[in-house]
């Protein structure tokens, strides 16, 4: 795009003061490399004053915390342009998520004798320390092990869920368990693995993401956040020609070993710095775990531990308190669980009360 344009392409990126979550320097390097007119913006905890606005715009209990930076980068972008391109769909087309490699590795692990997995390997992993944040090696290793021995669909669901089945059993009130007894997330997800028509595990997982996570989370997030500020966001990777081409590729051109987006990275080697292509994917994560232990702790407690919230009858009060206490004492990382409960309660306050 930069090569085809007679004027510098405008690029936009957003970051955080917490460096573990900020990709600004990587975005800046790419912008400089292609000669773009680059714009940056920092999100700080006080930026969460925008939460009531987001709750109103989404109109449902939408709990993807990256809606915050998406809204802000859309607002900043709209000050310069009316239409912007994003990268949504690239991961689902060309296998960009780490979980695709993990699903493949788990197939090999699954071939070990069940007794060896359960009594030695999994027991050893459970002894690893907790905490350290969702991105720490120990947390990720334990999360992998809790799903590795499950059947494919349940394994995938365990790795993408905020609350897995045991967590929900501990959290839900008896009445809410009764109300939801006839439904399972597995039954909602499984048809997409079946519809893969005998394709390999990778293609089946890509299809499941394309038909669930992409339209129900990512596209909702970007569409609402961008249109809230009158910005039109377009996704070139979702052009049907690109999707059809990616679907025709053999799996080993999308995921090779542990290398995600294999073909896409090969093509881009002549265009982008190698340090950008070869680094680990971060995603559009938000340091909500830090914020819940700092500036937003009081707001969190006052919202989800309020008398009104605890009296709704959906969750066991002691289970909600436990999540808050363990997280704020840094004993466990319940960032995403607490964010989900927070957004649900804010939605109740806005639309139900």
Regions found by a protein language model. Give the residues of each.
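Short, well-ordered alpha-helices that flank and scaffold nucleotide-derived cofactor binding pockets
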Residues: 2-3, 75, 79
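Short beta-strand segments
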Residues: 10-15, 40-42, 73, 85-86, ...
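Short, solvent-exposed loop/turn segments at secondary-structure junctions
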Residues: 17-19, 45-48, 90-92, 99-100, ...
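A phosphate-binding catalytic loop at a beta-strand-loop-alpha-helix junction
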Residues: 1-10, 84-93, 234, 268
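A mobile, often basic/glycine-rich helix-loop segment
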Residues: 94-123
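A conserved beta-strand->alpha-helix junction
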Residues: 17, 24-58, 83, 180-188
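Acyl-group handling in specialized metabolite and lipid biosynthesis
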Residues: 12-17, 33, 37-42, 63, ...
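Adenosyl-5′-phosphate
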Residues: 66, 79, 83-85, 132-135, ...
